[in-house]
Amino acid sequence: KRDYAILVLTIHTGLRSCDVRCLRHKDIDWGKKTMHIIQGKTGEPVDLPLSDTAGWAIIDYLKNGRPKTSSDRIFVRHSSPHGPLGSTATMDTVLTKYILKAGIIVKSGEHYGMHSLRKTLATNMLVSGTALPVITQTLGHQDPKSTELYLSTDIQGLKQCALDPDEEYGEASV
């Protein structure tokens, strides 16, 4: 339940691993369905919507999966002592576990850590027509140029979408 909540929250919000690990109960306004966090990387505050899917995943974890602990962090270790999660590597291990379970083959040199979920969110937002300033704000970037790095074009994906003009329109007569 914890891993599911972590992955869903990351996919829906684009939070950095450090911000997911440090998320506290007081950071979530359940009535407004929002989160207010101070970003670990930049120290800047960011307000984000909390989707129903992510919210229910967190609630399910809190009610049915989280060990009893005095920690104010949402996500805690499940082995004793039940304190805050460790490093970003711990978060990457969560994702890696499910990549392997799903039988997904990651090519040598490909990056697939938790940070890749931020890029996926940014790309999906762009594809759905979300404006760059909104994507920038969602990712907690100060400079839109930082966001643009997340939106690099996937040449292989474009090649798969390309049409063969000869196939579509017949041989061109010159």
Question: What is each model feature region?
Answer:
Residues 1-174:
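Conserved catalytic core of the tyrosine transesterase superfamily
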